[in-house]
């Protein structure tokens, strides 16, 4: 490098990870306008600057694993995130925002009994007399538990991934369950929510109590992602705003055969990546066993039934059976399980 050379420093984000690229140009290779130069900040050698990095896993921040029942969608997720902190919930028709995010709930606590003069009452042995009393406390549910855990990791130079796993996402009314959290699903190139949302006063108070003392090492870089010079990290710590960090993964499963329960609208779908889990032989050697000693290969049965579904009048991919549709013990699927689960499903939902 010689005097007069030009060095171009370019910052970019790839899969949520901030990277820097240096490009060198000779004096005659590029023209640089004086207006391009701006002194941003003088950084002392003693100051440490952390890039927006995080330990990554293979897969997008938000994705739905879908396929026929029994294809191993939950098993696939477990294998991918087993070593990381994860929080699991299952949607159903009665799931609502409070059950997913959190709300005030009555709980029973033991408290001292006070006399008329305001002193604690004691029994004959001198022990304080206690009574049960109903109080209301804000109870965090799966979303807030994962949210807080992910921001706690942001206190480290390389935050570890935190997973929020939603089983059977289409069995619940997603619009009702997510509410305004829906807006947080829009992520920028760095993996943080594009549009922070304002938390209600009750939630803000509880989040401030938990997040207020967190030391976010990448606060300056995170704030730089947002226009207007706002200290969004301070807003997150105060609880006034909600913002998904780039290490919070939200993965869900969906049985395509159940998609008619609560249809997912197109706006919600666009905010997710979709991963199809196809039907395949898991090579476990499962066998259907009967009391008379007869045994039948499970995969051969599945293949024959799925071929009938595909080639017959049904012709619906989502009605097929996956390898893990029936639970096997010691590699055997009992006659009772086969009749009560497999044949019942085929009779009731397929044929």
Regions found by a protein language model. Give the residues of each.
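C-terminal regulatory/interaction module of P-loop NTP-utilizing enzymes
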Residues: 5, 11-17, 21-351
